[in-house]
Amino acid sequence: MSVVKEFREFIARGNVIDLAVGVIIGAAFNGIVKSLVDQVIMPPIGLLTGGLDFSKLEWVLRPEDPASEAIEKVAIQYGAFVNTVIQFFIVATVVFLLVKLVNEIRRQDAAEPAPAAPPAPTAEETLLTEIRDLLAKKG
């Protein structure tokens, strides 16, 4: 089997296509969540904290020396980290709710009883069937 044919079979499997779609949708969803956090959630929080922009919060370990170009500022930018943590919790919550929904649907599908088998023929019906078959053979 050629490599190209094997690759086509691999790509044609439903799981690979589903995974690719999931990755693409996940990347798009990440952009939406980032925008939600940066442009919708954090501005009101910044307003409540006196106009503080969380994405700019940092701990300066070594300040920049304007007299020397060789000494740059070294800082831990924990504000951006706070934004990223909020984004993570939003994504994790949405994924959790989706998984919970899918599991509930699967549980409901599994709980649905299979269609009942037709009742077994009575002794009278069995006897009549045998008589019909015998008459059909005699013709």
Swiss-Prot record:
It is found in: Cell inner membrane. It is a multi-pass membrane protein. GO terms for cellular component: plasma membrane. Gene3D superfamilies: Large-conductance mechanosensitive channel, MscL, domain 1. PROSITE patterns: MSCL (PS01327). One of its GO terms (molecular function) is mechanosensitive monoatomic ion channel activity. Its main location: membrane. It comes from the Bacteria. Keywords: Cell inner membrane, Cell membrane, Ion channel, Ion transport, Membrane, Transmembrane, Transmembrane helix, Transport. InterPro entries: Mechanosensitive_channel_CS, MS_channel, MSC/AndL, MscL_channel. The chain crosses the membrane at residues 16-36, 79-99. Channel that opens in response to stretch forces in the membrane lipid bilayer. May participate in the regulation of osmotic pressure changes within the cell. Belongs to the MscL family. PANTHER family: LARGE-CONDUCTANCE MECHANOSENSITIVE CHANNEL, MECHANOSENSITIVE CHANNEL MSCL. Homopentamer. NCBIfam families: mscL, PRK00567.1-4. This is Large-conductance mechanosensitive channel. It comes from Caulobacter vibrioides (strain NA1000 / CB15N) (Caulobacter crescentus).
